[in-house]
C-alpha cells in the first residue's frame, strides 16, 4: 500500500489523519489557520520534522487570502505566534517558523505568495535530503538479520518522507534483509502500536509489538542488537528529548549492554540549550492516561501525570545519527560536529 503523509498542491494542504490509523487511512484538508493548529495539537500530524513542515505550509494556508505582500507581512507575526504555541517541545517547529519569518520579512511585492510557497517547498526538499542521508549513515550500524527495538513512531509518518530512526530500520531491511523490529506500544497515545506497526506492515518489515514495560525482559531473554529512537529536541551536549518512555528504554539498554542510537536531522539540535535541563516538556491532558480513547480505566477523579516527553542524558546515548554522519558518544560537542 502506498500512502501520502502530506501533499501541498494548488495552494491546498492535505494531510493523512494519523489519529484514525491503523483502522483507516483518511486524508483531510487543512484549509485555514485554526485547522492547521488543531491538526498539530490533536496529533493528526506529529513527529518533529512533520510538525515543522506542516507549520511551514500552514503559514502559506493562513496568508493566501492576503491582498498584498505588505498585508502578509502585517498578518504574519500573529500567524507565526499562534503556530509556535501548538507543540512547545519540537524544535523543528520553531526552525521552520523562523525560516518562514525570514521569508516574510523579505517578501517581494510581485510574486510574494509564490515566494512564500517556495520557502515551504525548500523546507520540504531539505527534509527529503536529510532523511536519505540519515538512512545511509544509520544503516552502516546495522548488520544483516539485526534485531532492534524502536519507540514511538519515527517513519514516514513522522517526517513526510522516509523517516528518522524507523527510516533507518526500513532502509536496513531493504539493504540487508532479515531485520526484525520490536515495537514499543508507546503509551498513552499508542503511536508504536497504531502507527509504527502499520508502517512496518506496509513496508513488509517483520516486526513484533511489545508492551512498554517488557523491553528489559526482551533484552535479557530474547536478545536485542540495538535500540533506535528519534528526537524532538537535542541539546548541544547530546541530551535528548523524545517521546515519554525513551529514558527508561535507554537505562534498560545500558544495563544490558545494548547500543542506543538517536536519529534526527540537524534541525532538531538546539544549540541555544547547553544541556537538557532547559528543554520545555509539554504536559498533555491527564485523560489520555485515565481514559484512553474515551474509555475510563482508572477510578473516577484519579489524577494522572502525563508529560509527552522525557529527556535522556547524553551519556546513555551510544551515537547520534544526523544527515552529517554518525556522532559517537559518550560525550558530544554538536556545535563542532555540525560545523556551526
Language model segments and positions:
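Short, glycine-rich nucleotide/cofactor-binding loops
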Residues: 27-33, 155-159, 236-241
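Positively charged, low-complexity intrinsically disordered leader regions
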Residues: 1-37
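SAM-dependent methyltransferases
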Residues: 1-9, 14, 113, 328-340
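Acidic-glycine-rich active-site phosphate/pyrophosphate-binding loop
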Residues: 24-35, 144, 221-230
Amino acid at each position: 500500500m502506498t500512502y501520502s503523509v502530506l501533499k501541498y498542491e494548488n495552494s491546498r494542504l492535505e494531510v493523512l489523519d494519523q489519529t484514525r490509523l491503523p483502522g483507516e487511512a483518511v486524508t483531510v484538508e487543512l484549509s485555514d489557520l485554526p485547522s492547521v493548529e488543531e491538526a498539530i495539537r490533536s496529533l493528526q500530524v506529529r513527529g518533529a520534522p512533520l510538525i515543522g513542515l506542516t507549520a511551514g505550509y500552514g503559514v502559506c494556508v493562513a496568508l493566501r487570502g492576503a491582498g498584498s505582500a505588505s498585508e502578509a507581512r502585517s498578518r504574519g507575526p500573529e500567524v507565526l505566534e499562534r503556530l509556535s504555541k501548538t507543540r512547545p517541545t519540537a524544535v523543528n517547529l520553531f526552525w521552520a517558523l523562523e525560516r518562514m519569518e525570514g521569508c516574510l520579512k523579505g517578501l517581494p511585492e510581485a510574486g510574494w505568495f509564490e515566494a512564500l510557497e517556495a520557502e515551504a517547498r525548500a523546507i520540504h526538499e531539505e527534509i527529503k535530503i536529510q532523511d536519505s542521508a540519515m538512512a545511509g549513515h544509520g544503516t552502516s550500524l546495522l548488520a544483516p538479520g539485526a534485531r532492534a527495538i524502536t519507540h514511538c513512531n519515527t517513519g514516514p509518518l513522522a517526517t513526510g518522507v522516509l523517516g528518522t530512526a524507523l527510516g533507518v530500520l526500513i532502509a536496513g531491511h531493504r539493504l540487508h534483509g532479515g531485520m526484525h523490529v520490536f515495537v514499543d506500544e508507546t503509551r498513552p497515545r499508542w503511536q508504536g502500536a497504531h502507527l509504527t506497526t502499520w508502517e512496518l506492515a506496509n513496508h513488509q518489515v517483520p516486526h513484533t509489538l511489545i508492551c512498554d514495560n517488557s523491553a528489559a525482559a526482551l533484552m535479557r531473554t530474547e536478545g536485542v542488537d540495538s535500540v533506535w529512537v528519534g528526537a524532538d529536541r537535542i541539546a548541544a551536549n547530546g541530551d535528548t528529548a523524545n517521546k515519554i518512555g525513551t529514558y527508561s528504554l535507554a537505562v534498560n539498554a545500558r544495563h544490558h549492554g545494548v547500543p542506543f542510537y538517536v536519529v534526527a536531522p540537524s534541525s532538531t539540535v538546539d544549540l541555544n540549550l547547553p544541556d537538557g535541563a532547559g528543554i520545555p516538556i509539554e504536559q498533555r491532558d491527564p485523560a489520555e492516561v485515565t481514559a484512553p480513547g474515551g474509555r475510563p480505566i482508572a477510578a473516577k477523579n484519579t489524577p494522572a501525570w502525563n508529560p509527552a516527553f522525557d529527556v535522556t542524558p547524553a551519556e546513555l546515548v551510544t551515537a547520534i545519527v544526523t544527515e552529517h554522519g554518525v556522532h559517537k558518544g559518550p560525550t558530544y560537542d554538536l556545535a563542532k560536529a555540525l560545523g556551526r
